[in-house]
Each structure stands twice: as structure tokens, then as C-alpha cells.
From Swiss-Prot:
GO terms for biological process: arginyl-tRNA aminoacylation. The keyword ATP-binding applies. Belongs to the class-I aminoacyl-tRNA synthetase family. It catalyses: tRNA(Arg) + L-arginine + ATP = L-arginyl-tRNA(Arg) + AMP + diphosphate. InterPro entries: aa-tRNA-synth_I_CS, Arg-tRNA-ligase, Arg-tRNA-synth_N, Arg-tRNA-synth_N_sf, ArgRS_core, DALR_anticod-bd, Rossmann-like_a/b/a_fold, tRNAsynth_Ia_anticodon-bd. It comes from Chlamydia trachomatis serovar A (strain ATCC VR-571B / DSM 19440 / HAR-13). This is Arginine--tRNA ligase. PROSITE patterns: AA_TRNA_LIGASE_I. A motif ('HIGH' region) lies at residues 123-133. Pfam families: Arg_tRNA_synt_N, DALR_1, tRNA-synt_1d. Keywords: Aminoacyl-tRNA synthetase, ATP-binding, Cytoplasm, Ligase, Nucleotide-binding, Protein biosynthesis. The lineage of its organism: Bacteria, Pseudomonadati, Chlamydiota, Chlamydiia, Chlamydiales. It is found in: Cytoplasm.
Length: 563
């Protein structure tokens, strides 16, 4: 659907070109108004054009307004030095809601659907997923849901760490201790720690481990059998967590790209991009002080080689139009070097196809990196289990009479919702403080606030004996609270555009929180049952219900019909 912002931008662009045909193409500065008494949107371009046109901003604003059709607006005002404030008419907002209602059911389809690959979560085999994987998994899943909703073909890739020296250590340790079967990741993690200690202390063990890496790469039957067993145990454990988080992923580990590594290095060499540095093969770039090493001095490959091969495969074989990799911001330099190398090699046709979606750290309430008291990473499964228990405690405190059945059903939904929302509502680039106490609050910018507004609408339906709310209804907007709610609802598609453009889910969480506040004000100020506007107000309730439900689904949150 054409958003209010794009509609207004089109009107202002045409008006500026009619008023000042000598101007070249402009990037307009039109934003939602910062305060309600300024109207719905404001155009700030008159100030920018003052120097170019050598006229006062106010005179420029007057010329622009003179070329804008008045029909969609109840007022167009010039304020201050030359800000143009627009207020849409209530009739126009009502008509736009009808279109919004139809398109909400089908998703706001992108004009040019693309093949989008999102690489996220990506834990390492033989290690527990920890709190660092939480951010990648939640952010990646949200972006995948949003891209899918607007019609893109999304491939969700789990680029698990399933190759390398660690497997040589594990295979050697398993061979020497005659362990035939491993059934749980906890056993595997304990073995990994023991194998790592031996590798650091015992030079002979280290040599045998390195030999097993070579054996694995060469397809040795015993080494491959143990490797497959290790991967199977780990992936089963990962899938348990993905089920709890309601996240879908297609696993394609580092090992998948092994057949292409030598060929990629040879191709880079044929393009004169490779320089020998202390025996290692590196790709240098003028813009960076360090190179991307693609082959070690001993002839071995590393994760950079795999990443280059993966990028090439995703473009050439998967036919990706866009590639997103969701990892912590600490890997930013690596991905800048990766992009530069793939551009130079022609694997990436142009800039803008690849994006590193970086994110900050999770901190404890003291502002330190979130770890156990002993300094180890907090296991993700334990964190999720704790969230569910904390949510149950919160429910009991609010509803002492809650049944065990309700507690068992609602606790996991509230706990997982709270964790996801707390993460997504923080700007992904920033570090954020993890606090169960804050994330489980029933007020403020939390998952509980969204859910409470949704449950309130379900309560309206129950009280009035309605199975569903009207999806089509002639609408007339009268009250300020109705107008504010209508305007906020209509901003949903432009917020979705912004979320996907910036790859930042917090724009969506901020919007949904604002929507709950507008709905709560509407519920307070506008009587529904038995009023002259009952059907129209039920229609607004229905649109709010559907928008909240859709928005929460895009965040990966679940709804409840009552609390």
C-alpha cells in the first residue's frame, strides 16, 4: 500500500518542481510531527532550499504550499521559519483505513520481491548455545519474518561451526577413551573441555588431533562417523532451543563449503588479488590496514576462506539479491574485509547487496558482560527456563487464584515474549542491560504492555458476545482519540519499511508500544458498547487487534486471549 509518508512525499516533490523547475532531484525531509499540535507530518525542506534559491525559507514554503492540492488535508500551515505542517482530513484517514484493512490481511507486498538470505544464530557444534546466540537468533528471526511478510523469498541459514581443529581434538579424545556413543550435548561439552586441555598440554595429542583434522578432510570413514555423531547430538540440542523460541532455520554448516575452498583461493589468485605474507595467502585492500587471510602458511584454510566461498555460493547458486549476516558488532572489520574481497573478485555484483547486521553486548544490571559468577557464558537453555519460571511467579503475584493449567500454558508464552521483546526493543547496535524484573513488568515498553492491550480487545468481544470484530465498516471519525488511533494504525506500513531499510527491529517495537498507548487512550475516551458509533469503534478495535497480532507475530511473540 502507498504509505501516508510516501503519498505526502510525492505531493511535496511535485509541488517543489512546479514551484521551482530549475531545481534538480531532491531527497525530501518529511517526518511525522514531533508534537500533535503541529499536525500529522512536517516538511523541513524550505530551510534547506533557502541557500540554493536565495530566498527566505518562509517565502519558499509559501510557494510550495501554493502547488499542493488541499483535498486530502484539513489544514496546511507554515510555522516558524518555514516548517510546513500537514494535517490530513478525518475523511481521508477513514478512506485510507479501508485500504489498510484489506492489505493488512495479505501483507504489504514489495514492488519488486527479492531473494533474501539471512544468516543468523550459527552456534558452534559441541558447545552450548549461550546468551550471545540469543541476540543473533532473535534479531535474525524478526528480520526474516518482516522480509517474508512483504513478499520477499527468504532463506534462513544456520551457518553452524561444524569444521576445524576442534573436531580433530574431539575425535582423537573419543578414539583414545573408547567412547562409542554420546547422547547429550552436556556430555559432549564436558568432553570438549577435556580434549581442549589435552590439546594445550600434550604435544603428542596435539599432533594426533591435527592428523585427524586431515583425516576428516580426506573423508576417513571412522573420522567421518564420529564427526556425524558429534554434529547430530549438537543439532538436536540446538533444535530444542529453536522450538522454544519458535524459530525456523535451514542448517548449512561451514563444512558444506569445503569442496569449494581450493577453487576459491585459485580463482582469487587468477584475478591477481592474492599476496603472500609470511607464507600465508592474503588479500590486501587500500582502505584497510590489515588483510583478509584466505590460506594459512601451513596450507590450511580458515573461516575467512569459508566465508568467501559462502558468499560466492549464495550469489551464484542460491541467486540471492540480498545477503544479511547477523553477528555481534565485534566482527565488523572481518565483514568489511569480506565484502571488499568479494566485490574485488566480482562475487558481489555491487555494494548494498551484503549487509552485516551487527549488535551490541548483553550486560548484567551492574553494566558488566552478562556471565555466570564463575565468569562463564550463561547457557541459553538455562536462561530461557529461568524466564519461564520468573513469568510464572509474576502471574501468581498478579493472580493468586490462577490454575496450574493456565500457569503451565501462559508462563512459557510470557517468559519467552519478555526475553524477545527486551532484546528487540533495544537498538541492536547498543549494549543492553538484561533484567528479568524490568522485562516482566505489566507497564512501560514491555511485551506485557502489548499483550495487555490485545487481551483488553478480547475482553470487549467476550462482554459483547462477539466471535470476531468487523473487518469492513463505513467509518466516520469524530473524536480526537479516534483520529489519533487511526493515524497510528496507518503508520504501520511505513514503520515496516523503516524497519527493513535500517534492519532495526526497535522501530517496530516502538511503534507497537505507541499503538497500545493510542488504543488505551481511545478505550478510555470513547465509549463503545451502546454508543451511536458502536460499529465504527468496534471496527477500530478490530483493526488494532489485527495490527497488534501481526506486529507481535513479526517480532516472534505469541498472543493470549486472556491473562
Amino acid at each position: 500500500m502507498t504509505t501516508l509518508l510516501s503519498f505526502l512525499t510525492s505531493l511535496c516533490s511535485a509541488a517543489i518542481h512546479q514551484a521551482f523547475p530549475e531545481l534538480e532531484e531532491l531527497t525530501l525531509d518529511i517526518t511525522p510531527s514531533t508534537k500533535e499540535h503541529f499536525g500529522h507530518y512536517q516538511c523541513n525542506d524550505a530551510m534547506k532550499l533557502a541557500r540554493v534559491l536565495r530566498k527566505s525559507p518562509r517565502a519558499i514554503a509559501e510557494s510550495i504550499v501554493a502547488h499542493i492540492p488541499p483535498a486530502p488535508f484539513s489544514s496546511i500551515e507554515i510555522a516558524g521559519a518555514g516548517f510546513i505542517n500537514f494535517t490530513f482530513s478525518k475523511e481521508f484517514l477513514a478512506s485510507q483505513l479501508q485500504t489498510f484493512s484489506k492489505e493488512l490481511a495479505n501483507g504489504f507486498r514489495a514492488a519488486s520481491p527479492q531473494k533474501v538470505i539471512i544468516d543468523f544464530s550459527s552456534p558452534n557444534i559441541a558447545k552450548d548455545m549461550h546468551v550471545g546466540h540469543l541476540r543473533s537468533t532473535i534479531i535474525g528471526d524478526c528480520l526474516a519474518r518482516c522480509f517474508s511478510f512483504v513478499g520477499h523469498d527468504v532463506l534462513r541459514l544456520n551457518h553452524i561451526g561444524d569444521w576445524g581443529t576442534a573436531f580433530g581434538m574431539l575425535i582423537t579424545y573419543l578414539q583414545e577413551t573408547s567412547q562409542e556413543a554420546i547422547h547429550q550435548l552436556e556430555d559432549l561439552t564436558a568432553l570438549y573441555k577435556k580434549a581442549h586441555a589435552r590439546f594445550a598440554e600434550d604435544s603428542e595429542f596435539k599432533k594426533r588431533s591435527q592428523h585427524n583434522v586431515v583425516a576428516l578432510q580426506s573423508g576417513d570413514a571412522q573420522a567421518l562417523a564420529l564427526w556425524k555423531q558429534i554434529c547430530s547430538v549438537s543439532e538436536k540440542s540446538f533444535q530444542t532451543i529453536y522450538s522454544i523460541l519458535d524459530v525456523e532455520l535451514h542448517t548449512r554448516g561451514e563444512s558444506f563449503y569445503n569442496p569449494f575452498l581450493a577453487e576459491v583461493v585459485a580463482d582469487l589468485e587468477s584475478k591477481n588479488l592474492v599476496t603472500l605474507s609470511d607464507g600465508a595467502k592474503c588479500v590486501f585492500h587500500e582502505a584497510f590496514s590489515i588483510p583478509l587471510m584466505i590460506q594459512k602458511s601451513d596450507g590450511g584454510y580458515n573461516y575467512a576462506t569459508t566465508d568467501v566461498a559462502a558468499m560466492r555460493y549464495r550469489i551464484q547458486q542460491d541467486q540471492a539479491d540480498r545477503i544479511l549476516i547477523v553477528t555481534d558488532s565485534g566482527q565488523s572489520l572481518h565483514f568489511q574485509l569480506l565484502e571488499a574481497t568479494c566485490l574485488a573478485a566480482g562475487y558481489l555484483p555491487s555494494k548494498g547487496i551484503f549487509s552485516h547486521v551487527g549488535f551490541g553486548l548483553v550486560l548484567d544490571t551492574q553494566g558488566r558482560k552478562f556471565k555466570t559468577r564463575s565468569g562463564e557464558n550463561i547457557k541459553l537453555r538455562e536462561l530461557l527456563d529461568t524466564a519461564v519460571e520468573k513469568a510464572k511467579e509474576s502471574l501468581k503475584a498478579h493472580r493468586p487464584d490462577i490454575s496450574e493449567e493456565e500457569l503451565a500454558y501462559q508462563g512459557p508464552i510470557l517468559g519467552i515474549n519478555a526475553i524477545k521483546y527486551a532484546d528487540l526493543s533495544s537498538h541492536r547496535i547498543n549494549d543492553y542491560v538484561f533484567s528479568f524484573e524490568k522485562m516482566l513488568r505489566f507497564e512501560g515498553n514491555t511485551a506485557m504492555s502489548l499483550l495487555y492491550a490485545y487481551v483488553r480487545i478480547q475482553g470487549i468481544k467476550r462482554r459483547m458476545g462477539l466471535e470476531s470484530l468487523p473487518q469492513e465498516e463505513p467509518l466516520a471519525i469524530h473524536e480526537p482519540a479516534e483520529e489519533a488511533l487511526a493515524l497510528t494504525l496507518l503508520r504501520f506500513p511505513e514503520i515496516l519499511d523503516l524497519t527493513l531499510r535500517e534492519l532495526c527491529p526497535h522501530f517496530l517495537t516502538d511503534y507497537l508500544y505507541a499503538l497500545t498507548n493510542k488504543f488505551n487512550a481511545f478505550f478510555r475516551d470513547c465509549h463503545i458498547e451502546g454508543s451511536d458509533s458502536q460499529q465504527e469503534r468496534l471496527y477500530l478495535c478490530g483493526l488494532t487487534e489485527r495490527t497488534l497480532s501481526t506486529g507481535m507475530h513479526l517480532l516472534g511473540l505469541k498472543t493470549l486471549n486472556h491473562l
